[in-house]
Amino acid sequence: KGTFWVNNVNQYKRLAICGGIYSNYLALQQLLEKCKKLGVDTIFCLGDIGGFGPHPDRCFPLLRKGRVETIAGNYDISLAQERKDCDCGYTDPRDNYFAQASYNYTFAHTSKENKVWMKTLPSQQRFLLGNLKVLVCHGSPRQTNEFLWESSTPNHLLEKFAVDYKADVICCTHTGIKWHRTLAHNKHFINVGVVGRPNS
């Protein structure tokens, strides 16, 4: 595993990382335009392309044209596998009610072609940012729909992820709320937030 980081990963100097697009193609357009002006090497999207917004199929051409490196979120996996729900991981019945309504709409308005494309998405990706070993995923390195809240996630769990996955920086999304924590040995855990919904 030690040589994995040296021989088999891409290396970047400047990049952008975002979370859920949630069918908000207008927000995605703005992101792509801003990244072009900033001259980033590449853009990573950490999953959940569809959901909540009205036009999921308008996002996919933008992702492809922008050559956005996309990770599979729980929404993408469920749509690709034609599951009955989004596998969001909610425990509150009210959240599940609205999530189901959103998923049903997104499923009906996502083309077969795009569902097939989502089957090709990886669950995580590794790369070098300068000398830093970076791992990007959706929920956590161990589970796509794991909620890691800033208020309740202990340092020792995040530090264990850094050790187990040999990463200096781990980036995720899923909760939709951005936060950053510096850990022991100058490791970092970052929730990048989302593009397509308010930060709440």
Where on the chain are the PLM-derived regions?
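Metal-dependent catalytic neighborhoods of phosphoester/phosphodiester hydrolases
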Residues: 27, 49-66, 79-91, 147, ...
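Internal, conserved structured core segments that host functional sites
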Residues: 116-150
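N-terminal active-site segment of His-dependent metallophosphoesterases
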Residues: 1-68
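Gly/Ser/Thr-rich beta-alpha loop segments that engage phosphate groups in nucleotides
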Residues: 21-22, 49, 53-55, 75, ...
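Conserved beta-sheet core of the metallophosphoesterase superfamily
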Residues: 151-200
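Active-site neighborhood of divalent metal-dependent phosphoester bond hydrolases
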Residues: 66-126, 152-165
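Beta-strand-turn-beta hairpins that frame and shape the catalytic cleft
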Residues: 8-16, 126-135, 183-188
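Active-site neighborhood of phospho(di)ester-bond hydrolases with catalytic His/Asp-centered motifs
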Residues: 18-19, 43-48, 69-74, 137, ...
